[in-house]
């Protein structure tokens, strides 16, 4: 492992001293290591990134999401040093950075392949790069008026309801927006997709888990303005068509997980027992 990328979120408190220390830790483990620094993921999606052996993310969970989308096509593993609020995906705290880098070069880690989503807008020829690690959300616009949705799974009608929106989430995203919408926490290596309605006007409409290979079609039957498509809470697009197709992407996010990190402990400390507001990024 000689080619290391570092992706820095410039909105976070990351001093030059912190970066110098990380350079030092890397070169202590491998004096020949080549380090390339990226800022706010700019240039990370270029073909040259394919040569990277790993990318360290200095930021929070939101920075991990952006990094995952940028690197998805290149199969480059990533891990995060938490400089955000929650640190569920970016699980390494700054004081443990040296130990994590040592374990990285010793090979004392495993790689988790996380499902990603892709989205197609019916009737639009141009294929935009709608990839998501957490979730893809279709919601009403600015008006406080609900929208009528009809859901099809593998071209079979599932249900129709009125609601503020619909979340389609991966297991990774099950601890994000869909959790707030009443969805279950899904163990991250399961091959499933989740549909979670947002504020449905019905007591009988509840989140559902589907086979990971399912194709989900969301049809907008009644609207007062164009709904909005949101990718991982970071990218959005007004939807002028009446149907959105969401399915599992052929790409996966490769997350580096160190052996001393326990998913259930992280779940307890970062989600279950967390009392202060999760501000996110």
UniProtKB/Swiss-Prot annotation:
GO terms for molecular function: ATP binding; metal ion binding; NAD binding; NAD+ kinase activity. Its main location: cytoplasm. Its cofactor is a divalent metal cation. Its EC number is 2.7.1.23. It is found in: Cytoplasm. The keyword Cytoplasm applies. Keywords: ATP-binding, Cytoplasm, Kinase, NAD, NADP, Nucleotide-binding, Transferase. The keyword Electron transport does not apply. The active site is at residue 61. GO terms for biological process: NAD metabolic process; NADP biosynthetic process. GO terms for cellular component: cytoplasm. It comes from the Bacteria. PANTHER family: NAD KINASE (PTHR20275:SF0). Belongs to the NAD kinase family. This is NAD kinase. It comes from Clostridium botulinum (strain Loch Maree / Type A3).
């Amino acid at each position: 492992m000689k080619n290391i990328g570092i992706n820095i979120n410039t909105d976070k408190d990351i001093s030059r001293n912190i970066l110098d220390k990380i350079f030092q830790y890397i070169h202590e483990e491998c004096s020949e290591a080549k380090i390339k620094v990226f800022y706010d993921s700019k240039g990370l999606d270029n073909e040259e990134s394919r040569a990277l052996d790993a990318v360290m993310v200095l930021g929070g969970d939101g920075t991990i999401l952006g990094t995952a989308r940028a690197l998805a096509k290149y199969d480059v593993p990533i891990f995060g040093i938490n400089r955000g609020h929650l640190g569920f995906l970016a699980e390494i705290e700054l004081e443990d950075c040296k130990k994590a880098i040592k374990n990285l070069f010793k090979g004392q880690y495993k790689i988790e392949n996380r499902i990603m989503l892709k989205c197609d807008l019916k009737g639009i020829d141009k294929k935009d790069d709608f990839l998501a690690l957490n979730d893809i959300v279709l919601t009403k616009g600015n008006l406080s008026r609900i929208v009528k949705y009809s859901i099809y799974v593998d071209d079979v009608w599932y249900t129709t309801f009125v609601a503020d929106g619909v979340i389609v989430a991966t297991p990774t995203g099950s601890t994000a927006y869909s959790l707030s919408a009443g969805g279950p926490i899904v163990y991250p290596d399961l091959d499933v997709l989740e549909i979670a309605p947002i504020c449905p006007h019905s007591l009988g409409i509840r989140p559902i888990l589907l086979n990971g290979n399912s194709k989900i079609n969301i049809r907008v039957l009644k609207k007062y303005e164009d709904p909005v498509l949101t990718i991982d809470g970071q990218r959005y697009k007004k939807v002028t068509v009446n149907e959105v197709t969401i399915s599992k992407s052929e790409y996966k996010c490769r997350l580096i997980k160190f052996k001393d990190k326990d998913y259930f402990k992280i779940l307890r400390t970062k989600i279950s027992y967390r009392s202060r507001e999760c501000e996110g990024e």
